[in-house]
């Protein structure tokens, strides 16, 4: 039901598509790789599918790096592999995952009627940069090339050194980890080293998106959140997501506060050793849309000097309503 609900938010329904839209978690063992890794596949596809055509965005992953990351291979291995495929995938070390994706995909391509795949690459503004149909025999090699290109299009914060990052919304519709690990510079995976860049001392998040349907995966990546966000968390969905990946710390609940003001004042209290005029802060709507942001006075001169950024307005203090909610926002303005 949860899978169908998410598809519905994207307009993918039986009425809109003119075909049945089915969610299924039942899988069967399809075979194994040369290393003995078991390969699972969707039972309904095994029994009824004449052809299989995976469709997915090709982009960098939030938990591992390699020749293939998020894309068609992962859709075949983890998506159509169901809980069995996902569980086995996430039980191995991060360094092994790209190799695993390629090996398991080869087994699937050899045993299932995969016609090919449809790869989607987006630019830094979540606009479609390219859609490419790839025949099965070229699927892996072409995905490797598309991933390298997609990384050159990735958005990034205007600076990689911050005292504080304020995020208006987190959610699965922005990143599989709620807040993109590549943007905030945090992995929080036990036994794995953290990223060297960007370096952000504290991350605060105001809200959880409605489109996330209570799945707050990634909330453990941040330091401060609001009661509003915590009240929206579906613990069952969040825990299932993180127990499947085994990255359980990403589901830990951070310090939370009744209002935006209280949360941000706490973050500033933790930064009290930094002179106010030197505090480096950025406010963004989410970790996907980074075209517009608010920056503190300490950052502004270095951005202006690059000539790559346009200043849209004068410096001003952050504004709050009577309930302590932030009204100075990049997204839709709050009126109450």
Where are these regions (language model features)?
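Gly/Ser/Thr-rich loops at beta-strand to alpha-helix junctions
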Residues: 1, 59-61, 171-173, 285-289
């Amino acid at each position: 039901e949860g899978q169908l609900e998410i598809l519905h938010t994207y307009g993918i329904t039986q009425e809109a598509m003119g075909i049945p839209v089915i969610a299924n978690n039942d899988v069967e063992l399809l075979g194994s790789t040369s290393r003995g890794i078991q390969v699972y596949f969707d039972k309904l596809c095994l029994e009824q599918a004449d052809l299989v055509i995976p469709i997915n965005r090709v982009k960098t992953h939030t938990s591992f790096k390699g020749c293939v990351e998020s894309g068609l291979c992962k859709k075949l291995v983890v998506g159509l592999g169901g809980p069995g495929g996902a569980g086995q995938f996430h039980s191995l070390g991060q360094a092994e995952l790209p190799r695993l994706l390629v090996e398991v995909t080869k087994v699937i391509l050899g045993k299932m009627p995969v016609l090919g795949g449809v790869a989607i690459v987006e630019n830094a503004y979540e606009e479609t940069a390219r859609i490419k149909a790839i025949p099965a025999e070229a699927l892996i090699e072409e995905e490797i090339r598309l991933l390298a290109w997609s990384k050159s299009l990735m958005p990034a914060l205007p600076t990689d050194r911050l005292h504080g990052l304020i995020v208006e919304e987190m959610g699965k519709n922005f990143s599989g980890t709620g807040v993109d690990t590549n943007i905030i510079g945090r992995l929080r995976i036990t036994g794995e080293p953290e990223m060297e860049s960007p370096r952000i001392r504290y991350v605060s998040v105001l809200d959880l998106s409605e489109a996330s349907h209570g799945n707050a995966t990634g909330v453990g990546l941040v330091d401060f959140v609001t009661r509003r966000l915590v009240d929206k968390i579906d613990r069952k969905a969040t825990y299932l997501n993180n127990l499947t990946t085994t990255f359980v710390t990403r589901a830990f609940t951070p310090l939370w506060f009744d209002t935006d003001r209280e949360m941000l004042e706490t973050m500033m209290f933790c930064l009290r050793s930094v002179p106010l005029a030197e505090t480096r802060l950025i406010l963004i709507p989410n970790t996907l849309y980074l075209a517009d942001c608010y920056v503190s006075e300490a950052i502004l001169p270095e951005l202006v000097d690059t000539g790559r950024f346009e200043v849209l307005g004068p410096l001003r203090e952050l504004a709050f309503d009577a309930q302590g909610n932030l009204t100075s926002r990049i997204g839709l303005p709050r009126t109450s």
